[in-house]
Amino acid sequence: PYATFPAAALGWVISEEKFFKVKFVDYLKLRASWGINGNRDITNYAALSKMLAEKSLNTDLNGNPITIPTLEINTMGNKKLKWEKTEAYNLALDFRLFNGRLNGTVETYYMSTTDVLVNRELPTITGYKRVYANLGEIRNKGFELSLSSTNMKQHNFEWTSNLIFSLNRNKIITITGEKYDVFDKDGNFVGQKEPDDKTNNWFIGQAKDVIWDYKILGTWKIGQEEEAAKWNQAPGDFRLEDVNDDGLLTDEDKQFLGYKTPRFSWTLSNTFTLFNDFEFSFVLYSLWGHKGSYNLAKHADHIEDRCNSRDIPYWTPENQLDDFARLRSAPAKGVDYSVWFDKSYIRLENIALAYKVPAKFLKKTPISNLKLTLNVKNAAMWAKDWKFGDPEDGMRSQRIFTFGLNMTL
């Protein structure tokens, strides 16, 4: 489909105005922009119905394993699929201060995305698994700061820094737009409300990456056998909060427990130059305020239960942990839930050391320039609670040492 995406931008260099007399400000510019962007980043033929061909393993009448080809309906078609549109407003201030010692940009933005393209999960009763659809509206607002500074500059020493900080907040405003009537306990009409989409974990007024799950209150302890038995559990199993205290665990007991993506991030780099020959630099960055699930902490029906290859702690009567269940633990009345841990972390991403051999030492050689380098990638990482591999991908990240020699003949 075709669509139109207009945009406009304005800029004002305040520091060039005659009335501007602030001596320590070298440059000051105010920028504002507005525009509508389009997105149709979906797979080819996403708007068409699809069949899924698979193979299932079964046995014949004699008990021999056989493979049975299957064909099932997978994705529902949607001929009305259209562009996702984002209307964005940006306001920024660029500056340079103290004879160029400090440069930076402060920017804030507001975006409203409508007709959001989503691969929506469908109820089983429809006969389909998923459908690409345009749904609702999501609003984003955020703040970004970037700074570049020369902290110290002497004849034989220079220290420079760069900082980038950003945060973003999003909120689901509407999903389908359909509303239902709301009545009070006496049957009086009090208004209308749009329902949440619990199947896809989308909730009006919440972020699209919000975590909606049962809250874990630790584990059942020795001496609580009778209470745990009411939930078909035993000491060492995770204890879930029954919010309305009705003896059941339903959607009414689920809570908003945090977010799956970082609430803010920052990157800091520093470079030190000594005698124009030695250069040392390092880069730190951090993602903060998000959570990730680690369901091996349940110790339920996994190979790790039997070999514990990942050295995962587990509850015992002698060591009654709250963050990890007993081996072969049981869920409360069979409900499904995840175990969430804080994934906030700070990483020393890179350390670099370089030495440029002075020209006077190369006079009697055919080499005109010689530079030696040492680089360490993923030098160190500190995580608040996450101890299960790299918080970015869950794997055991490598520390890489690189030696280099650059020369010009």
Residue spans for each PLM region:
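Extracytoplasmic gating/loop element in the C-terminal half of outer-membrane beta-barrel translocons
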Residues: 233, 287-372, 376
